[in-house]
Amino acid sequence: MTLASAEKEMVGVLTFFQKETRGFRTGKAHPALVETVTVEVYGTTMRLSDIASISVSDMRQLLLSPYDAGTVSAISKGILAANLNLQPIVEGATVRINVPEPTEEYRREVIKQLKRKSEEAKVAIRNIRRTFNDRLKKDDNLTEDAVKSLEKKIQELTDKFCKQIEELAKQKEAELATV
């Protein structure tokens, strides 16, 4: 494992954390709220983002425009089945979703999930560091100074990515608190 490959893995953890937390409902309409919803169409299961365009019509409303108007009712059923506490409104060939303001109880629950997910991401980052350091110590071709230098660099990367995860979590928490 090289320093570059360790950094690439850390970027992957950060990206995964961002995708996971994007789906948290903060009270503002965002396509990520529903894009991963699965819908039964054409005899198969597909992601909503693959069968409809998802746009934000205003701060609290999503507009879904299916590529095939015949899938409107399946989209509505898929959203209801996803248990997202969202009510789809079918309007001809489109589906509107009003995003309700989250309750205090929901906000507390999401903040708990957010803290758990951020801790999991930081643990994953630290595990990458540990794996890198273990491989360094087993490499007989490196001098002691080179090992120390690389350990310092991987620690700097670890600190950088853990800080980014904390900042993203704080932003999401602030978003939840201000709605």
Swiss-Prot record:
**Any one GO cellular component localisation term in the record:** cytoplasm
Q: Which Pfam families does UniProt cross-reference here?
A: RRF
Report disulfide bridges, numbered on this chain.
none
Q: Name one GO molecular function term.
A: ribosomal large subunit binding
Q: Keywords for this entry?
A: Cytoplasm, Protein biosynthesis
Q: What is its main location?
A: cytoplasm
| Gene Ontology biological-process entries | translation; translational termination
Where in the cell does this protein reside? Cytoplasm
Return the similarity comment.
Answer: Belongs to the RRF family.
Job description of the protein: Responsible for the release of ribosomes from messenger RNA at the termination of protein biosynthesis. May increase the efficiency of translation by recycling ribosomes from one round of translation to another.
Listed name of the protein: Ribosome-recycling factor
The species this protein belongs to is Chlamydia trachomatis serovar D (strain ATCC VR-885 / DSM 19411 / UW-3/Cx)
Lineage of producing organism: Bacteria, Pseudomonadati, Chlamydiota, Chlamydiia, Chlamydiales
